[in-house]
Amino acid sequence: EMNSTCMIEAKIEYDGNTRSFGIGLRQDNSFSNGYYLRFEPFYNRVVADMWPRCIQGVNQWYVDGDKPFMVELERPFDYRSLENNKVDIRVIADDTILCLYVNDSMALTMRVYNNERPFWGFFVNDGSIKVSDICMYHICKGENYV
């Protein structure tokens, strides 16, 4: 389970034909309600997303779930430069902030509006991944960390 303030590190190797993969954070126990940091090799991008995206309103035009993701939460990433389709990730969670670092060369930050859900895990869509060297560090408020 995730504390409100923690750091997660891992190495992810993906199959060359994988559509998308990533890490789900602040998830409910069914992994269907939370935040996702998603790698999309075909589109050469990394995306921060959440599900459900917004609450459905009274009228049909209030539905916001047909957007593929929040465009402002996308970063370009050149997957062709990777050696053996491997990425090193570091996620820092600090209450309502999630920050993803990829290979110490790219950062993506998002605000989370529900940091009480404690579950997290890795996922893949249409492909396969190997996750290794998984470490979670619990950070106590007021302490320095490196």
In which residue ranges do the predicted regions lie?
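Extracellular glycan-recognition regions
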Residues: 1-146
